[in-house]
Amino acid sequence: HTITHTEEPGRVSIAKGQGDDTIIRTIETNRLYGGLSERIETVRGINDAEPVACNRSVRQYTDGGWLLVSETEAFNTPLARTTSYEYNSQYRVSRINRPDGGYTRYEYDGEGRVTLEAEPWAGGGEQVTRTEYAGLRFYDNRPARVAEFRVLSDGTEIELTAAAYAYERSPLMERVTKTVTAAGSGQEQTSVEETYGEAAAYPYAAGQTKFTRDIAGVETFYDYEAAVEHGAAHKKTAVTKVGGELAAGQSRKTESFLAANDTVLVEQESIWDGENWLLLSSGAHEYDEEGRRTKTTRGNGRVSATSWMCCGKLSETDEDGILTSYGYNSAHQLVETIRSEISDGDTVITPETITTYTRDAAGRVLQTRRDRGAMTTTESVEYDRLGRIVRQTDVLGRVTATAYSENGLTETVTTPAGATLVTERHPDGSVLHEYGTGQRERCHVYDIDHNCLRETVTLAGQAIILSRTLVNGFGQNVVQVTPTTAGFLYDRSEYDEQGRLIRAWRDAGTQEGAVAMTP
């Protein structure tokens, strides 16, 4: 592979590859007025009339050093989109302004830690995350409480979720307990993680995970010791339990034998049957000098292997003996995969499959061709200067075109049949409006109801409700409302503290017709 590096005053060019594969990356730097400096980076193929990517960044020198002022994608084109940055008196980012009208603003405490992060919300205000810090040691960046709010347009703040962290520390162990509460739910979700301290009995274990308990109550205990088998340096054992006890048919033990560089040489998994550990699976692994796995031998004798080159995988053979080979061009891009024929005696089950990729200088796939036996299919994709898909052609030659508004929030898809589907979004990604050929025009409205996030879908004019969904702070769907000829049906859901659905029922605004569901 060839890489050529050329330098001129204020300009660096790096050419990668040979012949038609060559990709040229150019970086220009220029001094501007007012202590500003610009950096323009372009990427193009050797045969491209125009770059496939051109980005510009502007920095300003201040008492706080060089600060990023703006970044522009698709620079010097009609599609150019600029993100700008604002800073506070301490030279920390206070606001990021995005080209779609969105933004992120930050507030800091006296030690420079982020205490507030806010972005616009489709409900009319902001979605805000506030962070308080533990302060148990010097410059303690560990959170004590992280809360997510929705700030309504009238300034009212509604807390949706709050995660509280408790810390314990000793020479033998460090423990973090996380307790999450959420609006619209009376449950608490608690998880625990412990790590071995610096005085761990086995020095290698220091800083390693000792114990975890997830919100479902599943506990995993980790143990480390010196290994005396398989040429390993360390042995790691992980055992799952519930309430500190082994559960028949559920508890599992995973034993990993580790080399000095932490690669797994041998691993085996067992399940507890109530009296003994029964082996489920095992495997021995081999690696090359760069630590990449080259061979795995399972306990049942089945073998898989992988060979590597500088670009990535050269070939791999799975446990069924199926060989997949990979081909790269001189610019290190994957351009071909060949999957060997699968046969049963003289009967061909799946013929050899060759997949060929045509890529642009940015590495994006422009065309995919698949040759499977005597059958050939081709599909292609076109992108704009911002890297967005604007045209897709499927294997049957059908074309789907996509157009975007200037701010990128409206997407118009034209199907192969000529129909148009238009989707308008809020800067936070939420769908606001959907309409097009042959479909009902729908509006999405977001707000807060009963301390839950509510999404209401209506027909145009917002007089007729199609659906209404309430989601609590845990992200659990608690009520789904659908209209009927006589009114509305309410599908309600109830969850336990482990996040499992335990009860669901339907009513017309009453509590009748409950249907219990087992966890």
What is each PLM-predicted segment?
Residues 1-519:
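Beta-strand elements of repeat-based all-beta scaffolds
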